[in-house]
């Protein structure tokens, strides 16, 4: 009989206990099923970068590659992806204590956009503060260029702002 093979990709361990929980579950499963193959990937990110990793994992698995090769190539791919984001609101970060409620309110009232990234350690880091979307979008493109982006797969997500996502897509296509 064929042994079980499982793969899990979690949100960054710097923001959530999902990775630790998945690793604990992996260890328990392997104790009961010693021949099983289970890989757990700490994305060190969230959102669209997490989706890129999942898509690569699915693509490699669909090719029928051996488990170890899928795992190794996915881990290598993760070194070539990056998360950049622009936040219009810091409400959720204030709710979970990551920023003060006063700072979150000021960002909203002043129309400040926070441009940031996921660090190599999986924490969210601010890169810039901009007044409005018109300044934030070019900042995102500039940071993509600084990170060495030369075209390729990009995932754009939005939270109830499809118009802004569409504008960014147009600017992205024009740049690359």
Positions of PLM-derived features:
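N-terminal glycine-rich phosphate/adenylate-binding segment common to multiple enzyme folds
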Residues: 1-19
């Amino acid at each position: 009989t064929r042994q079980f093979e499982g793969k899990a990709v979690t949100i960054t361990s710097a923001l959530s206990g999902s990775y630790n929980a998945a690793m604990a579950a992996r260890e328990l499963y392997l104790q009961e099923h010693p021949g099983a193959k289970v890989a757990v990937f700490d994305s060190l990110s969230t959102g669209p970068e997490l989706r890129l990793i999942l898509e690569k994992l699915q693509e490699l698995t669909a090719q029928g590659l051996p488990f170890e090769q899928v795992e190794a190539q996915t881990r290598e791919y993760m070194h070539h992806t990056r998360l950049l984001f622009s936040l219009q609101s810091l409400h959720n970060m204030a709710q979970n204590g990551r920023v003060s409620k006063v700072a979150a309110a000021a960002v909203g009232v002043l129309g400040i956009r926070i441009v940031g990234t996921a660090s190599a350690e999986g924490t969210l880091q601010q890169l810039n503060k901009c007044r409005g979307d018109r300044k934030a979008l070019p900042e995102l493109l500039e940071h993509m260029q600084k990170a060495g982006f030369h075209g390729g797969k990009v995932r754009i997500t939005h939270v109830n702002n499809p118009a802004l996502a569409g504008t960014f897509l147009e600017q992205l296509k024009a740049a690359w």
